[in-house]
Amino acid sequence: MTRAERKRQHINHALSIGQKRETGLDDITFVHVSLPDLALEQVDISTKIGELSSSSPIFINAMTGGGGKLTYEINKSLARAASQAGIPLAVGSQMSALKDPSERLSYEIVRKENPNGLIFANLGSEATAAQAKEAVEMIGANALQIHLNVIQEIVMPEGDRSFSGALKRIEQICSRVSVPVIVKEVGFGMSKASAGKLYEAGAAAVDIGGYGGTNFSKIENLRRQRQISFFNSWGISTAASLAEIRSEFPASTMIASGGLQDALDVAKAIALGASCTGMAGHFLKALTDSGEEGLLEEIQLILEELKLIMTVLGARTIADLQKAPLVIKGETHHWLTERGVNTSSYSVR
């Protein structure tokens, strides 16, 4: 099977499997504010991702590319919607285009359709610094995502089986590319120990890619004759990943992704410490179900509803929202307690 065929399978399986509410964000409840002393028109949702400034705290996270006409059309529509909404956009892994120049167009279309927007390049941790530079140049990227997908590779029938040297390669990439490097998980979450190693290696931000969104173990298992089903429930939830990393690295930049589906999810993720939030599966479904116009409407709706939530919480800025008091309960509370995180630090701030 070619890489392009595999990418098309990934898209179809991602849409058929969908997402479940297993992000841990349902364990998070905001403390109501009866006197917010704020007007909706005062709310400012601009944010920073490391040194990058963005007018939006949500972006279209990495999905696809290198799968021929199908992924070309998807990326074209995503780029148009991102441009019109004024939000950043990440492309899927560009390794296919580095290995097969005929696939470059499915990535280059993103910059063509969105000449002035924030665009993130994307490669796996097997990439070299030279490949990283080429990926950035290919689409005139403002940042580079390096994705960590160990579980996906292990379950993938033709996937990698060696993950040695990944941190060293990431460190080399961080020191040699001219744009900020974001290291991201792909739906299995991230621990504070892993995040610490990545910050030390030079990552400008980590995208925690929490459990509860698109499940690449399930996707790859659908492609196997004999399934490795125990990996389908493997990972750290989005909420738990955010809270435990923030407890250890309060001044470092985190991005939240992994099953976010609406403005309340976005608000909770930011209150748990994220500077920005990425959505992939939710936006892909919106595009598939309702077309480009429907996707744009969904993005705009989430941004408007986020402003409403910030208004009732009295949070004028994203920095204010990051300090909004909240209560953590259930399985997320249990996980964090066992991991040595004092959850009351969120409720009494």
UniProtKB/Swiss-Prot annotation:
Which Gene Ontology BP annotations are present?
A: isoprenoid biosynthetic process
Question: Which co-factors does it depend on?
Answer: FMN; NADPH; Mg(2+)
Which positions does UniProt annotate for Mg(2+) binding?
A: 153
Where does the signal peptide begin and end?
none
Question: Mind telling me which GO cellular component terms the entry cites?
Answer: cytoplasm
The record lists FMN as bound by 62-64, 93, 122, 184, 214, 258-259, 280-281
- Which Gene Ontology molecular-function terms are recorded? FMN binding; isopentenyl-diphosphate delta-isomerase activity; magnesium ion binding; NADPH binding; oxidoreductase activity
Recorded hits in InterPro entries, A to Z, give: Aldolase_TIM, FMN-dep_DH, IPdP_isomerase
Tell me which SMART domains the record gives.
IMPDH
Catalysed reaction(s) here are:
isopentenyl diphosphate = dimethylallyl diphosphate
Write out the entry's keywords from A to Z. Answer: Cytoplasm, Flavoprotein, FMN, Isomerase, Isoprene biosynthesis, Magnesium, Metal-binding, NADP
EC class of the enzyme, as a word: isomerase
| Keyword Magnesium tagged | yes
Q: Which SUPFAM superfamilies match?
A: FMN-linked oxidoreductases
Binding positions (substrate):
6-7, 152
Where is this gene product found? Cytoplasm
Q: Tell me its EC number(s), please.
A: 5.3.3.2
Highest taxon of the source? Bacteria
- Classification via CDD domains: IDI-2_FMN
Q: Which family does it belong to?
A: Belongs to the IPP isomerase type 2 family.
Could you give the subunit structure recorded for this chain?
Answer: Homooctamer. Dimer of tetramers.
NCBIfam families (UniProt xref): IPP_isom_2
Q: What is the stated purpose of this protein?
A: Involved in the biosynthesis of isoprenoids. Catalyzes the 1,3-allylic rearrangement of the homoallylic substrate isopentenyl (IPP) to its allylic isomer, dimethylallyl diphosphate (DMAPP).
Q: What is this protein called?
A: Isopentenyl-diphosphate delta-isomerase
